Amino acid sequence: MLYHDSHDAQYRDPLGPVAAGNRLTLRFACDESPEVLLRTWDGAERLYPMVSVGESLYEATVTVPDKPMLFWYDFIIRRADGDVRYGNSRDQLGGEGACYDGQPDSYQVTVYDPA
């Protein structure tokens, strides 16, 4: 099982837009590999190893950029037979995602100015 739902607080906290400089916790369910990476993009790509926080559940907490912008994320699942990518649903409306052979459509987080 590979699963993330950007509309469910169990997998994305907080839901909705995030104030600049605040933290965002993302979780991913995976029973196919012990190695899951969170990939983010805010003008530069970053990879974060996700930590097991329960049976088949992985978590990473990141600080979003300190200025308003669109912040993007998806997941890389390392398997013996090759990497699997997991990203936004093909309709790009968020919620439950999809597996991709190559670069996935990323999930979007709106980072806003809290002032």
What is each model feature region?
Residues 1-21, 44-115:
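The feature marks proteins involved in alpha-glucan
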Residues 22-26:
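Structural beta-strand segments of beta-rich domains
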Residues 29-35:
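Short proline/glycine-enriched turn/loop motifs at strand-loop junctions of beta-rich domains
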Residues 36-42:
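Conserved aromatic beta-strand anchor motif in extracellular beta-sandwich/beta-rich domains
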